[in-house]
Curated annotation (Swiss-Prot):
This is Uncharacterized oxidoreductase CzcO. The gene is czcO. Coiled coil: none annotated. The keyword Signal does not apply. Involved in potassium and divalent cation transport. Enhances the transport activity of the cation/potassium transporter CzcD. It comes from Bacillus velezensis (strain DSM 23117 / BGSC 10A6 / LMG 26770 / FZB42). It holds the Pfam family Pyr_redox_3.
Amino acid sequence: MYDTIVIGAGQAGISVGYYLKKSKQKFIILDKSHEVGESWKNRYDSLVLFTSRMYSSLPGMQLEGDKHGLPSKNEIAAYLKKYVERFEIPIQLRTEVISVQKLKNYFLIKTNREEYQTKNLVMAAGPFHTPNIPSISRDVADHIHQLHSSQYKHSKQLAPGNVLVVGGGNSGAQIAVELSKERVTYLACSNKPVYFPLWIGKRSIFWWFDKLGVLHASHTSILGKFIQKKGDPIFGYELKHAIRQKKIILKQRVIAGKQNEMIFKDSSSLEVNNIIWATGFKNPLCWMKIEGVLDKEGRIIHHRGVSAVEGLYFIGLPWQHRRGSALLQGVGNDAEYIVKQMNGG
């Protein structure tokens, strides 16, 4: 019987592991990956974080290099691996969770390897886990090449011809800009993109966010509610410039697929050769057989990561407590809080 089991060995899970280690608990982290940092290594080749190194570290260990520079995805993958080794955080890799049940005062976790029992369970699968691909993708002809942004690595994966990137977030923007350098590129967004500079003066915009309290704004504060209502901006002006230069053609929200064509909100249509779905991720909780975890809309019920189900915790959710919760720098504060609550507050 473990004191705590953490499901997910990304930055959220190992941040919890850091504080569990300090509290002398008997714990283990389970992850289906073959190595720590695998999810970062598998993302598209050109990915660079828009948070500088000084805002891309976990508790207890700084990311090496120019603190004002932007780290690559491989740099983050290597950092996470080194972090686990330095703090000797116990992780069982190649372990996929099949089901989770609550039995009286403990959780029973069934995996592809064995069964585990634990008093506390932390769900750290994070926001970037299971691709969310709209059902209209099934209405598109088979010969049209489709990928989720998490599967995209480089342009050589695509078929000849144009590409439609669906999704107005930062990943969609970066991928569209990259592809626009070699082929006709369309970007479909629900809303008109809002752009923020990556740098103000010689400082990262996240330095200014930090000093102005934006990163620390809780989801219930006036500032936090305002930011959530506005949605996430596109960081940097590369997309804006590409649209102005007509290298990227902006389209409205996709509402339907019809064989070779995609239909948009303004009733226009477009014949496409490739589609990249930069449509985010969903929480993979279909195997959790516990009542009271989700509300009627399928959202996780929690307060700062503490579930109404005794002994159950969540970490790595967007706006779990504040604006910085889903960022590398911010997840440590949430991890410290839930371990503190686990130990009696």
